[in-house]
Amino acid sequence: MEASRSIPPQIPGYTLIKRLGSGSEADVYLYQQLSPARQVAIKISKNTLDPRAAVRFRSEANFMGQISTHPYILSVYENGVTVNGRGYTVFEYAPGGNYKTFLEHGRLTADQMLTVGIDLASALFTAHRKGIIHRDIK
């Protein structure tokens, strides 16, 4: 059953600020965490989770937690299921935005592209060492 993307769920301990983006299986929102007080990004599944999907969603958060000590991988703070059955994962908020938005307003220099490529390769290498394969790199 598809959940409405226009109405993000209420999550206890967090106050919605705005929508940050959307992927094929989840939306990402900026929330204010009440304690400790900080802004966080929350990835929320678009659909209610059947038991198999819930296991995958939880596994993804656990894998992210294992590799989040890497400087280019966001920290995971919490993982759960909303009252209406949608999975969510609370991440560190990186306020810089994404590269797609950046590229819509300008170009990267050769040095910047090289730096991004090296940083991305380093993060992927860290994940691969733990047996994690990212299946949605854009």
Q: Can you say where each PLM-predicted feature lies in the sequence?
A:
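Activation segment signature within eukaryotic-like protein kinase domains
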Residues: 116-117
